[in-house]
Swiss-Prot record:
Signal peptide annotation: 1-19
Species name: Agrobacterium tumefaciens (strain 15955)
Its biological purpose: VirB proteins are suggested to act at the bacterial surface and there play an important role in directing T-DNA transfer to plant cells.
Upper lineage: Bacteria, Pseudomonadati, Pseudomonadota, Alphaproteobacteria, Hyphomicrobiales
Bilayer topology term: Multi-pass membrane protein
Keyword terms of this UniProt record: Cell outer membrane, Crown gall tumor, Membrane, Plasmid, Signal, Transmembrane, Transmembrane helix
Record's keyword annotation contains Transmembrane helix: yes
The protein's name in its UniProt record: Protein virB2
Self-association and partners: Interacts with host plant RTNLB1 protein.
């Protein structure tokens, strides 16, 4: 127990305030630079206004078109290729195959099911 007394840190107000001042003075240049950069580079936000733009149905339709288009088809092909490679090396399980095939069915079947239920074109 005596060996720990040599390394014991005695904190009082003076040493604690000195430690805090050392930390603050070492961080001051970077904090000052960050504050100066944020003040000098501020400007109006380039966000879309709430009143203008498109309605939510158009945005959802654009997302569906993106997912069900060539991007989604590429993802489906890559998933099937990954299953084939996994199966070739003996790493594929029935759960993996069911998950990928189920995801593809849900991804491409949701649009058809939604149009069928709502009577859309």
């Amino acid at each position: 127990m005596r060996c720990f007394e040599r390394y014991r840190l005695h904190l009082n107000r003076l040493s604690l305030s000195n430690a805090m001042m050392r930390v603050i003075s070492s961080c001051a240049p970077s904090l000052g630079g960050a504050m100066a950069w944020s003040i000098s580079s501020c400007g109006p936000a380039a966000a879309q206004s709430a009143g203008g733009g498109t309605d939510p149905a158009t945005m959802v339709n654009n997302i569906c078109t993106f997912i069900l288009g060539p991007f989604g088809q590429s993802l489906a092909v890559l998933g099937i290729v990954a299953i084939g490679i996994s199966w070739m090396f003996g790493r594929a399980s029935l759960g993996l195959v069911a998950g990928v095939v189920g995801g593809i069915v849900i991804m491409f079947g949701a649009s058809f099911l939604g149009q069928t239920l709502t009577g859309g074109s």
